[in-house]
Every structure is written in structure tokens, then in C-alpha cells.
């Protein structure tokens, strides 16, 4: 039978509940337990797919095509377990399900209410499909006190009563701020947050307290007394250098031991922390460093590129080097020469994005990388812009553009109207909905055996995750290849270009998919490992 850990947050948002959940899952895995993590998001969007990156950050895509919260990326990277559609739910999806049931008459004429109908829907989501797991960790998005989170908190309160005794534990993550004028950490925000949580009917078993300095024993005792939590269950969560130090830090503070104790599991299997210690050692003891320019359009919010950032660091882990990131807003190149920005970097990465803003800057970045022989990695939109650059400057198609930007005589990149998903034909219309209408999830690609990318993968058959509505136009393939841009990877039916590369360039690869979504600290994605390796070679030339 699965045991349930419910993780809530208080005082302020962005305390790191997702990292805390992922780290705890990793610690339980290290003891040999099977763990699943689920995220419950209180916003009314059905999913984050149509939300601005500045509002939400990255949209993490799963193998089965779910557009989910970026925390699911942390879950995958820390546990290695691929997430799916059933690991993330939003208030919007819950209400949509309920309204569909009401329209069908499933409620037999009853008045549909938050309690019991909404809370029952949440509970069903939490409980379903957990037969193969020892622990299910549920992170509740938002902060205690938010009106949006109330149905979720009520649902997990009910579960605490309905689950067998000893199979549900509540962890509350809070902040203990340091007040310079007083010269001390303050417990009052945590006390009030716990008071709010208890007023809902949830008594936390464990307090995980964020702080920027050591919490004195006297303050821990104070929190224990006023929050009605055992002193051993008041666990400090101090700031660390990297997120991959968190599992080791939490283990030293006894978080996993306290969770197991709360479940009455004693003695518990000893954890094997060797792989986390190896990752931490490599991060803190690099043998060199490289600088990668990321030419993007959402650089004002780094969370928009969360998986990309982590995948680049994984590439550094694979090569035992530190990866420094130089963030460049693509629009800058539309009014300034790219050379001063890019001459000293060891690699250029152009990530995914949507819309015309910054496109010309990304095209110029691809041109600089091609002409100067600087390693170039184009992902999704970055591959499309590399193809437009080649069409303009190598093939001579001056008007080469993307139909995403408006009507064009030379749509080197165009809207996909249909594609195969398994044996089913998916179709889309230009005037259709935005939400859930892209090519989403894992798709197969076939690589040319003699291509550079096939050598990197060590295979000619790959499965990678996609999130795009536009695609390089196959009608331009022959002319682009004649100019030197090799279409090294295609969809199995030969219709959709998946990867491009230059044979006469040290490392210039564009991919239509998002390899960053499948990279792990213990298993760096081969493309990122190879890209950083090429950057190391470039660093010897600069």
C-alpha cells in the first residue's frame, strides 16, 4: 500500500517546494523505495501551455504530450522516473472534468458544489494509479492562505482522515527571515503560517524551514513549542550552492529519517548517496570552464529556460567543466553587431520560442556561428532560424521566412497541418485553438547512419519530446542540402525534418525537438555532452 506525503508552502511563494519534493523523493529512492511525485496547481488554466513564459516560466512536456509545470522537470531529473499526464493537474482541468460530467448527467441532478464534487475530483486524482509505488509525494502549488488553494487543502485534509492510519504525512515548507536591524532570525511568519494551516484542519508533522543561515537550537525549540511539532521534526533548509546539493543537505539534516519515522518505519534501509556525492564533487571541483551564449527572447526570466540551463550543466558534468552562461536578448542583434557579443564565447545556443520578436537576431546568431565556425546548437525555433539563415545566405532566397511571422512568398518554415501520431493522423487548422494543438510529446526520428548526430547518439533511431506548431518546409530540403545543410534526421514517414547539420563545421546542429527535457545529472543528454565537448575544443582556439 502506498504512503502519502503532502507538501504545502507558507509565508511566501517560490520557496522551492518542487525542489524539496524532488530531493525527498531522491532520498527515499536512495533507500530502495519506489516513489511517485504529483503536482497540484491551483490556477484556472487547463494547463500552462498558453501561459506567457514571463508568467509561468518553462512549460515542461512529458513523453505522453502533457504540457505541465516546470517542477515536473525537477521530479524527472532528481528521480529518473518519466512523468506523465497523471502527475500534474490544475483547477482548470478539474473544473472542466466536473462540468463535462454535469452536462452528461453523471451527478443525477445533484447541485454541483466545491464540497464534495471538486474535492472528490482532487482526491480521485491523488489516489489513482499508485499500486506500484511505496510513496506518493503530492506538492500543493501556491501558498497557504491563497483562496485558489483552498479546495486542494480541503481535499488533502479529508484524505488524512480517509486513508488508513499512519499512511499520510504533512510537510509544511516555510521561510524564517533574517532581520538585519534586529540581528536575528524570526519565527513569527512560520508560526502564523502554521496557525493558518491548522485552522483549515491540517496539522503539519514536519516543518521544513528555509533560512539563509544556521537556525539556533533555541529557535527550533520555539517553533516546536508554538507550532506543535516535535523538535526533531523542525528541519532547517539552508541555502546551498546548487540544487544538486539539496538531497545531501536534507539527508544530513535528517529529513528522510524524520519522514520514515512519522510513518513508523523503523528500522529503515540505509540510503546509498554515492551518486549524489559524485555529482556534487564534480560540480564543486571542475577541471576547466567554458562560456555558452544563450541567444533567447525570454532572458529576463531564467525559469523560462529551466530545463535548458540544467541540461547545459549536465553537459558540464559529463566533461568535468563548469559551464558559464552569457544571456543575450536576441533583439539586441537587430540593431547591433553580434560580433562583440559572440567573439569570446565557446558555443552559441539558440533555444525554442514563439513569435516574430527576436527572430532576426537569432538568424544573425546562426550566421555568425556558421561563418566563424563556433559550435552552434539550435533547438526547435533555433533550428528553424538556422534553416532560414541558410536559405537566405547560402541558397540566395532573400525573402526566406516563416509563415509564423505573417504571409510570405518563401515559407522555409510553415505551419504543420497534419502529422502521424503512432498510426493516427493528427490534423490542425491555422485558425484553431492555441491550447493543446501543437505537436506534443515523444516522437520517433530516423537519423542518417553517416551523420554527426547519429554518431553522437550511437543510434539511428531516437525518440525525443516535441512542442511546436511550425516545421521546416520539406519543399526546400533539396536546395538547402545542395548548399551544404544536411537534413540528418527525419520523421519515419520522411515528411518532417527533425535535425540538420553542416558536414564542414566543427559542431553545428539544429534539432526540432527539445532534448533538454530528457537530460539528467546522472545521464546527461548526449547532445549536450557533445556540445560542451565541442565548446571545450573551441575554448582552446579563442
UniProtKB/Swiss-Prot annotation:
The keyword Metal-binding applies. It catalyses: UTP + L-glutamine + ATP + H2O = CTP + L-glutamate + ADP + phosphate + 2 H(+); L-glutamine + H2O = L-glutamate + NH4(+); UTP + NH4(+) + ATP = CTP + ADP + phosphate + 2 H(+). The active site is at residues 380, 514, 516. ATP binds at residues 14-19, 71. CTPSs have evolved a hybrid strategy for distinguishing between UTP and CTP. The overlapping regions of the product feedback inhibitory and substrate sites recognize a common feature in both compounds, the triphosphate moiety. To differentiate isosteric substrate and product pyrimidine rings, an additional pocket far from the expected kinase/ligase catalytic site, specifically recognizes the cytosine and ribose portions of the product inhibitor. HAMAP family: PyrG. This is CTP synthase. It comes from Brucella suis (strain ATCC 23445 / NCTC 10510). The lineage of its organism: Bacteria, Pseudomonadati, Pseudomonadota, Alphaproteobacteria, Hyphomicrobiales. The gene is pyrG.
